[in-house]
Amino acid sequence: MLSGDEFARRAVAALKPRRIAVLSVHTSPLAQPGTGDAGGMNVYVLQTALQLARRGVAVDIFTRATSSSDEPVVSVTDGVTVRNIVAGPFEGLDKYDLPTQLCAFTAGVLRAEAVHEPGYYNLVHSHYWLSGQAGWLARDRWGVPLVHTAHTLAAVKNQTLAEGDRPEPALRGVGEQQVVDEADRLIVNTKDEADQLVSIHNADPARIDIVHPGVDLDVFTPGDKAAARAEFGLRADEQVVAFVGRIQPLKAPDLLVRAAERLPGVRVLIVGGPSGSGLDEPTALQDLAVDLGIADRVTFLPPQTRERLAQVYRAADIVAVPSYSESFGLVAIEAQACGTPVVAAAVGGLPVAVADQRTGLLVPTHRTEDWADAIGELLVRKGAGFSRAAVEHAAGFSWSSTADSLLSSYGRAIADYRAPQRPSTQWASRARFRPRRLSGLRR
């Protein structure tokens, strides 16, 4: 006989959606991570969609078209489709301008769904607050639950802002509060992020699910360091510290370059492209290396494919993640899966992604001297079991496990949605409605 808890667990698991709409307004899952606004969220959206499709859930991902050459519909694989919605000009729109295009984007999403019979989607999963605004309306129009993943919060980013970086606007905080109030379930990467949602936005803890992101354990594996170094023209006998990510103040690649000045003989490998406020001075990092007199020890590479990125991790002795804010840190997990220890800032989800003193070192400050000391220490200690422990640690973060946890959250969202409705929120009535479909109209 099943216990009450086990019966409830199986009942929720049985509520698996057939088809979901995933909203990612500001960045496409098909974009190359490390360029523009493409980063860990792109990887998350695509990899979870692929895993959900393998579990029998069809996934339509809606994103804003950014080129006239974008096909309206792109089939990624059986069960995963990307739909490029025209909303505003293709080029020249900053992410901070996108709230002006939310009406156009949402209209495009609703029109795409309107050609189908009612009930085509069983659930909406929005990523980032812009998508949450669109998802809120789609949820009410379609009569299905809304699951939301914030990925980052304006208040958290502003509390840990890099010097000279642009703060998040107040309107984002208002928009995030609305989405938190309206979402049926909230997905976070770590308990720390859950606590932030509760303390900053007064989220109901009962509606929050902690779901760790994953890593592709088939791509990111240990490999031949000598071959990897040869691929990038690195000497076999030099010490290499790599940075992978968007080049912007938030990610703090300049901190690594400054630390390298204090570490004679250490080569820094920077992999990524300018993004966000980093676009204001696209050559600032190169100029810094010149000013410090270490330009000959700093190598720059453009964003890489996943397979080439795995080679970057294998070529490095250490991967550095000096971000001022990081909700999780996929780069840290990918590097460890390749057997490379990590030096990371002790912020956000990085203390979960990196096991301090076992798979790498966590640095509690952003002082150059502290980072130079930590990197120097790990370069000396890296042979003391760090690589083996890193691989073992990363093995606990698979996209397969992430997808299973998402399905459990979806099941709870569907179960709660079918249950008696909660009272209206402070923002608006939660009443579900579906517009009457008018035949004979050309869209």
From Swiss-Prot:
It catalyses: 1D-myo-inositol 3-phosphate + UDP-N-acetyl-alpha-D-glucosamine = 1D-myo-inositol 2-acetamido-2-deoxy-alpha-D-glucopyranoside 3-phosphate + UDP + H(+). It comes from the Bacteria. GO terms for biological process: lipid biosynthetic process; liposaccharide metabolic process; mycothiol biosynthetic process. The keyword Metal-binding applies. The keyword Ribosomal protein does not apply. Mg(2+) binds at Y313, R314, A316, T340. Pfam families: Glyco_trans_4_4, Glycos_transf_1. Keywords: Glycosyltransferase, Magnesium, Metal-binding, Transferase. 1D-myo-inositol 3-phosphate binds at H26, D37, A38, G39, G40, M41, N42, K95, Y128, T152, R172. Its EC number is 2.4.1.250. Coiled coil: none annotated. UDP-N-acetyl-alpha-D-glucosamine binds at Q32, P33, G40, R246, K251, Q304, E326, E334. GO terms for molecular function: acetylglucosaminyltransferase activity; D-inositol-3-phosphate glycosyltransferase activity; magnesium ion binding. Gene3D superfamilies: Glycogen Phosphorylase B (3.40.50.2000). Homodimer. Catalyzes the transfer of a N-acetyl-glucosamine moiety to 1D-myo-inositol 3-phosphate to produce 1D-myo-inositol 2-acetamido-2-deoxy-glucopyranoside 3-phosphate in the mycothiol biosynthesis pathway. Belongs to the glycosyltransferase group 1 family. MshA subfamily. This is D-inositol 3-phosphate glycosyltransferase. It comes from Mycobacteroides abscessus (strain ATCC 19977 / DSM 44196 / CCUG 20993 / CIP 104536 / JCM 13569 / NCTC 13031 / TMC 1543 / L948). The gene is mshA.
